[in-house]
Amino acid sequence: MERMDIIIWLLAVVIVLTTLMIFLHLKTLKIIRLLFPVSKELSKKSCVFPWKKKWTKNYPPSSMYP
């Protein structure tokens, strides 16, 4: 019974945190960026989304609309 109570409490905490992140997503993103500067560097290098560069290189908008 104690384990179930802990699981329910953890789920409630997770739900509260997710709702706070949804409502204050801009502020939380700023905090996350401050806490994790590595993620900012990765996003600058576009290592997280490498297909964006490939798509723009191989298929420019001018070739898509002749």
From Swiss-Prot:
As for subcellular location, the record says: Mitochondrion membrane
Any Gene Ontology CC annotation = proton-transporting ATP synthase complex
Write out the entry's keywords from A to Z.
Acetylation, ATP synthesis, CF(0), Extinct organism protein, Hydrogen ion transport, Ion transport, Membrane, Mitochondrion, Transmembrane, Transmembrane helix, Transport
User: Which residues, renumbered to this chain, carry the PTM N6-acetyllysine?
Assistant: 54, 57
Judging by the UniProt lineage, the source's domain of life is: Eukaryota
What membrane topology is annotated for this entry?
Answer: Single-pass membrane protein
**Residues passing through the membrane, by range:** 8-24
Q: Name one GO biological process term.
A: ATP biosynthetic process
State if Ion transport is listed as a keyword.
Answer: yes
The chain residues annotated with the modification N6-succinyllysine are 54
Q: What is this protein's function per UniProt?
A: Subunit 8, of the mitochondrial membrane ATP synthase complex (F(1)F(0) ATP synthase or Complex V) that produces ATP from ADP in the presence of a proton gradient across the membrane which is generated by electron transport complexes of the respiratory chain. ATP synthase complex consist of a soluble F(1) head domain - the catalytic core - and a membrane F(1) domain - the membrane proton channel. These two domains are linked by a central stalk rotating inside the F(1) region and a stationary peripheral stalk.
Family membership, please give it: Belongs to the ATPase protein 8 family.
How the protein assembles, per its UniProt entry? Component of the ATP synthase complex composed at least of ATP5F1A/subunit alpha, ATP5F1B/subunit beta, ATP5MC1/subunit c (homooctomer), MT-ATP6/subunit a, MT-ATP8/subunit 8, ATP5ME/subunit e, ATP5MF/subunit f, ATP5MG/subunit g, ATP5MK/subunit k, ATP5MJ/subunit j, ATP5F1C/subunit gamma, ATP5F1D/subunit delta, ATP5F1E/subunit epsilon, ATP5PF/subunit F6, ATP5PB/subunit b, ATP5PD/subunit d, ATP5PO/subunit OSCP.
Q: What is this protein called?
A: ATP synthase F(0) complex subunit 8
Q: What organism does this protein naturally occur in?
A: Mammuthus primigenius (Siberian woolly mammoth)
Q: Which gene encodes it?
A: MT-ATP8
